[in-house]
């Protein structure tokens, strides 16, 4: 009896299977060239005010001799006009990049936020804009029109994968923190129309790592089928220095827990009953023409019913719309209007200028 040439037969069978799979994909109308891109509202360009860009000498007596200690609670911190980090709690330090320089609120490119510990969430809208504007916001990106929804214990991400042609996809993924402080998104299900995308990739001997060219992406790499994101590198200025220890879905947000192990002591607020607050202590702060030496400034919003909506690019507008007073120990208590309330009539229950 003549031996059957199994290896050639297996090779031919595999090749035919791959060709059939490639033919089936267009048949399900999932591969279409030239699909229109999802139009997200563009934020106004981030600007550094003239006073922040100009060279204003710092008097010797105002040079910073220590970092500015910081804490935040219930703050919606804008990284642009519409993308928000929900800071539930934060303890850290603001440090100027130039030794001895003050922390300049008018130039967020010139200081670093060193987070000791924090709990920070992002909702679906924020995740959409973060991924589309900052991670994959460049021409020819392999992923676009991304929509991310925290659901149950997973995130559901849909969008367009471009590999020669546009491939609409929906991916269900588990989230976890790696030992080196990155967010791991591990797909448990990948849908391309009615086709099992993970099974398809396996049949073709492919993976997300092989499919996606992420060389130009910001703060993300692929490892097999997992995506690894560096939370401190995917954000625009100010620069963040932090270590992620946990990530999970909570209350409709992708919740990130940071702990750098600095064990900074708790700060004592001058007015501890404020629900939504930022507090800055020690070091030197610059805000426009004002230099605050050995800073002691508590900042809250005029409307305490919801989180403090703060945008550092527009801090002076928020300050001008609010009010402040000195404390008995020469500190400042500042009441700012929420960024989203600028230009609107006073809200019911809002604390107005005395």
Which residues are covered by each model-predicted region?
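Short hydrophobic alpha-helical membrane-anchoring segments
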Residues: 20-30
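N-terminal Sec-pathway targeting helices
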Residues: 2-20
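Extracellular/lumenal and peripheral-membrane lipid-interaction modules
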Residues: 29-354
């Amino acid at each position: 009896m003549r031996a059957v040439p199994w290896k050639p037969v297996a090779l031919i069978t595999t090749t035919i299977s791959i060709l059939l799979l490639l033919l089936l994909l267009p048949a399900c109308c999932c591969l279409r060239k030239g699909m229109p891109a999802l139009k997200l509202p563009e934020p106004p360009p981030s600007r550094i005010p003239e006073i922040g860009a100009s060279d204003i000498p710092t008097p010797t007596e105002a040079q910073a001799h220590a970092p500015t200690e910081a804490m935040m609670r219930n703050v919606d911190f804008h990284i642009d006009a519409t993308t928000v980090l929900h800071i539930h709690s934060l303890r850290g330090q603001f440090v100027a990049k130039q030794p001895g320089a003050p922390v300049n609120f008018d130039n967020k490119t010139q200081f670093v936020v060193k987070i000791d510990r924090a709990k920070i969430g992002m909702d679906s809208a924020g995740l959409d804009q973060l991924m589309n504007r900052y991670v994959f916001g460049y021409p020819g990106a392999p992923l676009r029109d991304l929509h991310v929804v925290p659901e149950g214990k997973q995130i559901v991400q849909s969008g367009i994968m471009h590999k020669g042609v546009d491939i609409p996809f929906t991916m269900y993924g588990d989230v976890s923190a790696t030992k080196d402080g990155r967010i791991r998104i591990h797909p448990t299900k990948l849908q391309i129309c009615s086709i099992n995308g993970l099974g398809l990739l396996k049949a073709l001997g492919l993976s997300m790592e092989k499919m996606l060219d992420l060389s130009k992406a910001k703060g993300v790499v692929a490892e097999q089928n997992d995506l690894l994101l560096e939370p401190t590198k995917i954000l625009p200025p100010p620069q963040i220095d932090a270590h992620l220890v946990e990530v999970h879905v909570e209350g409709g947000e992708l919740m990130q827990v940071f702990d750098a192990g600095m064990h900074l002591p708790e700060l004592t607020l001058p007015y501890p009953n404020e629900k939504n607050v930022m507090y800055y202590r020690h070091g030197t702060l610059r805000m426009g023409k004002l230099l605050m030496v050995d800073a002691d400034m508590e900042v809250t919003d005029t409307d305490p019913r919801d989180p403090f909506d703060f945008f550092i690019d527009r801090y002076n507008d928020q300050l001008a719309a609010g009010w402040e007073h000195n404390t008995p120990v020469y500190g400042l208590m500042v009441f700012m209007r929420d960024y989203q309330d600028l230009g609107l009539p006073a809200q019911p229950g809002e604390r107005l200028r005395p």
